[in-house]
């Protein structure tokens, strides 16, 4: 069974120690609630991932574990088969003992867009909200973060993350907790909080921004990446039904509207540092993710539109700083 004792030990003497008052009970309930379904099968696969300490690890320019020279061809084939059990792999890519996990998303491209605008992560404690299988968490560690905590409620993402961590040696201060942000108390402790690809999935985007603020220390940095539309501060797209075949997209604001929301939530130093239209090369089907992807979500006659007729995905990166909060804002 996946356990979180190493995380509890790691934060026991940190500014996150007060989280231990509630976290073990919450994760214990999660474990009890997931005794059935696919999780037991995936955990059996995780228990087979016993490999030597990698001869090379690179988290600064990629997520590369091992050169591919330590394992025999038979061992590589076995490891490939084990990792394929965790399909679909959506966020990556990963290189594991020479095995190239070509994921649906080129998450490294997003990181390249983000990394040059954020405050240096060296010696920072970082929270990644909606972290998926953890690709960006490894890159955050590679950029010098002291501790990286990711939250995402998906059992599959947890197992994908655990697979990578175990093959990497299992000693790195990177942790994925199967939680939604609404399950976190106001920790007021993280130096940097990332929320990338989450806001438009939230029924209440203002509440999400407040939840993100509550995890930051005063002066901490929010890195927010989300879908946007063109328009002024009053422009917000609310899809009538689906957006890009997704039925869980609620609000897509303009950059101006999003910056106004952040100001309303008492962030300061708010700035948009990048706007990028998602390309068919950045999100696509692969051997490791064989389901539909971006090309299937766009109008075949006009890729500037989704199949529903909405503007095609455009993503903005907004950076802001937590101000001293006004406790009258709820």
Swiss-Prot record:
The gene is cmoB. The keyword Ubl conjugation does not apply. Catalyzes carboxymethyl transfer from carboxy-S-adenosyl-L-methionine (Cx-SAM) to 5-hydroxyuridine (ho5U) to form 5-carboxymethoxyuridine (cmo5U) at position 34 in tRNAs. One of its GO terms (biological process) is tRNA wobble uridine modification. Carboxy-S-adenosyl-L-methionine binds at residues 91, 105, 110, 130, 152-154, 181-182, 196, 200, 315. This is tRNA U34 carboxymethyltransferase. It is an enzyme of class 2 (transferase). Homotetramer. One of its GO terms (molecular function) is methyltransferase activity. HAMAP family: tRNA_carboxymethyltr_CmoB (MF_01590). InterPro entries: CmoB, Mo5U34_MeTrfas-like, SAM-dependent_MTases_sf. Its EC number is 2.5.1.-. It catalyses: carboxy-S-adenosyl-L-methionine + 5-hydroxyuridine(34) in tRNA = 5-carboxymethoxyuridine(34) in tRNA + S-adenosyl-L-homocysteine + H(+). Belongs to the class I-like SAM-binding methyltransferase superfamily. CmoB family. Keywords: Transferase, tRNA processing. The keyword Transferase applies.
